[in-house]
């Protein structure tokens, strides 16, 4: 199924995609290579389901990794399978010209939400991350996701990545973190021993919260300006008239709007 909301179908709002992750170009080339080589019996729906099953498997593996740390390596395999299902489904639908923009956008991001819930639930059960940190991170993630979906509907801006980080970069970062935790699950901070997942989880939660706040302020201002509820920035002042020998030259302000 497609995850591209830029297509318009039966009133489905067009949205401009913003994807600028570090791996965006390489990922696009890989997906365009994979799409024509995908067996005909595999559909976009199969890939979406594969992505969800992979996240459920990661959740179970995380829950068991507290007692069997080597399972973190299998979590990385699950993340790779999730990337394949979650990223290729839309590309395959567009390649085969069987897009369902509204259905794909809705189901794909609903699956993403359940996937995040499953993975963080597994981490909370593992003992590798405190339940409070996992819950707070999940709340911040959902807050940013809500802002993204609201902006897609009201402004027509669909932000897939934030700065150099998108879904693929987050998977890579999580895989590297799993490798670190496999050998060093705790780290000394301020003279105390803390779980690595907790330290980075708190930092990531703060970053997501700031991103959601900044995006919310920008979106609110953009909508207020569009609907006449907030004054635009004042135009630059016109330069003073300059007197030249043999004539008169008057300056005029330029508008960039």
What is each residue range found by the language model?
Residues 2-76, 122-257:
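Hydrophobic alpha-helical transmembrane segments
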């Amino acid at each position: 199924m497609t995850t591209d909301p830029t297509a318009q179908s039966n009133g489905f709002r067009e949205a401009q995609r913003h994807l600028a992750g570090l791996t965006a170009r390489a990922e696009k080339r890989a997906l365009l290579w994979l799409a024509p080589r995908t067996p005909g019996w595999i559909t976009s729906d199969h890939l979406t389901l594969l992505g969800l099953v992979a996240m459920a498997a990661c959740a179970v593996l995380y829950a068991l990794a507290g007692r069997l740390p080597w399972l973190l390596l299998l979590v990385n395999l699950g993340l790779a399978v999730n990337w394949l299902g979650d990223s290729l489904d839309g590309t395959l639908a567009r390649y085969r010209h069987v897009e369902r923009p509204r259905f794909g956008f809705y189901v794909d991001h609903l699956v993403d939400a359940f996937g995040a819930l499953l993975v963080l639930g597994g981490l909370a059960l593992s003992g590798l991350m405190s339940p409070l940190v996992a819950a707070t991170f999940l709340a911040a993630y959902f807050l940013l996701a809500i802002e993204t979906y609201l902006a897609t509907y009201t402004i027509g801006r669909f932000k897939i990545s934030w700065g150099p980080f998108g879904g693929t970069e987050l998977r890579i970062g999580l895989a590297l973190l799993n490798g670190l935790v496999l050998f060093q699950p705790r780290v000394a901070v301020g003279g105390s021993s803390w779980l690595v997942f907790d330290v980075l989880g708190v930092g990531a939660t703060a970053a997501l919260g700031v991103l959601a706040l900044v995006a919310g302020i920008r979106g609110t201002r953009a909508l207020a300006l569009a609907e006449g509820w907030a004054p635009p920035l004042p135009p630059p002042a016109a330069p003073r008239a300059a007197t030249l020998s043999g004539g008169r030259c008057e300056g005029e302000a330029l508008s960039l709007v």
